[in-house]
Amino acid sequence: MRRFLTTLMILLVVLVAGLSALVLLVNPNDFRDYMVKQVAARSGYQLQLDGPLRWHVWPQLSILSGRMSLTAQGASQPLVRADNMRLDVALLPLLSHQLSVKQVMLKGAVIQLTPQTEAVRSEDAPVAPRDNTLPDLSDDRGWSFDISSLKVADSVLVFQHEDDEQVTIRNIRLQMEQDPQHRGSFEFSGRVNRDQRDLTISLNGTVDASDYPHDLTAAIEQINWQLQGADLPKQGIQGQGSFQAQWQESHKRLSFNQISLTANDSTLSGQAQVTLTEKPEWQLRLQFPQLNLDNLIPLNETANGENGAAQQGQSQSTLPRPVISSRIDEPAYQGLQGFTADILLQASNVRWRGMNFTDVATQMTNKSGLLEITQLQGKLNGGQVSLPGTLDATSINPRINFQPRLENVEIGTILKAFNYPISLTGKMSLAGDFSGADIDADAFRHNWQGQAHVEMTDTRMEGMNFQQMIQQAVERNGGDVKAAENFDNVTRLDRFTTDLTLKDGVVTLNDMQGQSPVLALTGEGMLNLADQTCDTQFDIRVVGGWNGESKLIDFLKETPVPLRVYGNWQQLNYSLQVDQLLRKHLQDEAKRRLNDWAERNKDSRNGKDVKKLLEKM
């Protein structure tokens, strides 16, 4: 045993001595020019290494360098620069003075994908033909990334497309490994901070680049992300998921399949693809088993009452995003001009502004700024909602047009969702045509226009009982009638119809008609959506709810009573002209009785005098 251990120690000493001698005999700086030339020959980039190269033996034989940079031909700034670079090399090739790099590690790297880092073609450089009819060579089908392992730590990626704003990804950690067939795996994490928003993302998956650049596929097995900051819910948005991606060079197409993502309590699945032509062509086919927009897009609008107090609807306290000065003068929706799209969305459950929709289906197309929504429908509270329309952003001034169709939708839910303090419930059906310049609740209150026909059933308006108001007014003015007791401060109608017109925040109600077992009304009026005021004029016949029988009751059943309702929605006033009707009724009754008496005494002098008096009245 002692001899065996002695022999083993001798071999170990010889091995260590040999390796040490090899490292001492091979100068890593001898490979500097070789690496620079190889990088330039294979990629066209200029590699610059600052400071001397040195060996690092444990735990992996490596070459260490100081600052390094990688610059494209003619670029004004380097594409990659790093504080340190480590090359893990194989030992045996060094015996023949060859360099075999197994892994490259960059620390403190800054990667810039900006116009300043792009290659610039010299004026005398030859121009390749647009269509290359030469057959592909086997060498053309490999991956230019010929390193088995790449590791990037504590680095930064700066991305900028043309004149757009820069996007900076910080705290990057990237680990990539591949086999000789260019199939590999990767892990990535980073953080993006922009416009007072912070996005943290991490993902891992596999990639197949055996046919790159003609075809590249990747499977994102796990992605985790969290978004926090301005214009977001207080708790932020976080989720996870997986998907598959494929790039097809011949079609310039990027496809996403088997998408499965979550965002807070919302879920998404489906597929998407984009063809990168001069104007990108998008195609989306997405399904949402659950989509809670209230938990993704908070509302900050308020509705002000007469006393100035703000009423918060479904809004949450959020930090507003800063206004970017370069975007102030941009026409609204101009981003639609830069691409085309064919979109099909389906959602089993959608929550928006506190309203719960089911079976939502959307089909729309964008043709370089002309957005056509051919289908946008769903179910709400047992009713049907359809909202097809168009958004024309091809000019400086956008034009939006919608043709809403509602069938048996609870109106109280809609009023509450948009913060209208109107105590009104009932099933509403509506068919209309509205237009404006901005899709926004506040813009609708001020600047939209259109018209619609409205029908409502089982209507209930809290705060006023028209029947009770008229009957009590008749009793107070000495009418010899008795009303049935009704202590509800509610007006109920079995059916109500009207034609409305909207212009700059003012809704004009024409040809209002309503019926119930005790009421029949007609009228017209206006609602000011911005000021939350109204002024309506009704003619009401109380056809039921009276006790007993009398000529006055018969008169009131047949005679419309003028009723004006006006003022702030939360403090309504009314004006009721019952005394004039009663006075007219007494006058007519007196005339009738005098006329009857005069007829019975027409031959007498008194009868003739009364007859003459009635003719003058």
Swiss-Prot record:
Coiled coil: none
Keyword terms, alphabetized: Cell inner membrane, Cell membrane, Membrane, Transmembrane, Transmembrane helix
Chain spans, region Disordered: 302-321
Main subcellular location of this protein, as a coarse class: membrane
Domain of life: Bacteria
This protein's record includes keyword Repeat: no
GO BP, sorted A to Z: regulation of protein targeting to membrane
Compositionally skewed regions (Polar residues) per UniProt: 302-319
Annotated localization: Cell inner membrane
Topology term for the membrane: Single-pass membrane protein
Periplasmic-facing ranges: 25-617
Family under the similarity heading: Belongs to the AsmA family.
Role, per record: Could be involved in the assembly of outer membrane proteins. May indirectly influence the assembly of outer membrane proteins, potentially by altering outer membrane fluidity. Inhibits the assembly of mutant forms of outer membrane protein F (OmpF).
NCBIfam families: PRK10833.1
Protein name: Protein AsmA
Lineage: Bacteria, Pseudomonadati, Pseudomonadota, Gammaproteobacteria, Enterobacterales
